[in-house]
Amino acid sequence: MSTKPFYRDTWAEIDLSAIKENVSNMKKHIGEHVHLMAVVKANAYGHGDAETAKAALDAGASCLAVAILDEAISLRKKGLKAPILVLGAVPPEYVAIAAEYDVTLTGYSVEWLQEAARHTKKGSLHFHLKVDTGMNRLGVKTEEEVQNVMAILDRNPRLKCKGVFTHFATADEKERGYFLMQFERFKELIAPLPLKNLMVHCANSAAGLRLKKGFFNAVRFGIGMYGLRPSADMSDEIPFQLRPAFTLHSTLSHVKLIRKGESVSYGAEYTAEKDTWIGTVPVGYADGWLRKLKGTDILVKGKRLKIAGRICMDQFMVELDQEYPPGTKVTLIGRQGDEYISMDEIAGRLETINYEVACTISSRVPRMFLENGSIMEVRNPLLQVNISN
């Protein structure tokens, strides 16, 4: 029986060396005594959760963060032993499950903590207190709520507060007024807490890269870990070169010559102005290569060539400058020769952010993990295979 990891020549390459380099540089930037929390939610922003987590931990991260309890349990089942914080809301009836898997939750309201205490019948629940300083998503907002939290902890010794944090709404923007307001508000709200015994974190990638101090004792490193800028506004403020880890590739599955006046793809929106070589690429919007990318450049033999016509669910066509043999490599995100298509370029075409592009590339696209140019592992959820070297 074949052990080939995938049977369609479309794949993403994840450079674990790049992730390690970004983590190592960030650790040097924030200082040896500040914890680096590697954010690997949403399958590590589409890069591969367990593989990214292991690389980050090897490079100096001391703990992990995810968005939902399911992600944390998945990491535990894949063998990750490092501390894991769930940043999002977990219904209090599941706190025993979190404790079973040694997962730290976010306590985000007085009511949640009261219910969590009711459901913690044995053992203890570890949590970080979320403080809302202006994001208005999750968290306690007032000094009174903080005092109520402390009272709940006094009455419920099974509840163990291990950290406190907030999240900035505008840390990646040029205008710093709102960001600085949140920073000051955070310091005010946490003042009554026993901070000496807590992990205190407010800086995300944007704030962590921008700030020279004020990290408290932990920084959450998300988008920057993957070598992506938090925003274009920060281009001149990043203290070291971020190295992108994600590239996306396919091949020409079919090449044909169409005559002047013939059309391509649904809606017949593309019509050849002259006899033209057309290549078919087995990538479509079901893979996360969205229809709005019609007319976008891709790379073939180091040249920028444009997608012809509408993108289909599973395939798209490209206008070629000459005949190429089927099997010719195509790069959608990444480098060929002197040409480079960045995640930011694709985000610009989609009028969105690079975070969304990375998360949109679906699990139907196998991830190939490389280190120092060598393939270390290939993960294909469709075939439920992980092949390691």
Curated annotation (Swiss-Prot):
One MF annotation (Gene Ontology) recorded for this entry: pyridoxal phosphate binding
InterPro entries: Ala_racemase (IPR000821), Ala_racemase/Decarboxylase_C (IPR009006), Ala_racemase_C (IPR011079), Ala_racemase_N (IPR001608), Ala_racemase_pyridoxalP-BS (IPR020622), PLP-binding_barrel (IPR029066)
Active-site residue numbers: K41, Y266
Record keywords: Isomerase, Pyridoxal phosphate
SMART domains xref list: Ala_racemase_C
Taxonomy, superkingdom: Bacteria
Modified residues (N6-(pyridoxal phosphate)lysine): K41
Binding site for substrate: R137, M313
HAMAP family assigned: Ala_racemase (MF_01201)
Family that this chain belongs to: Belongs to the alanine racemase family.
Protein name: Alanine racemase 1
UniProt source species: Bacillus subtilis (strain 168)
Gene giving rise to this polypeptide: alr1
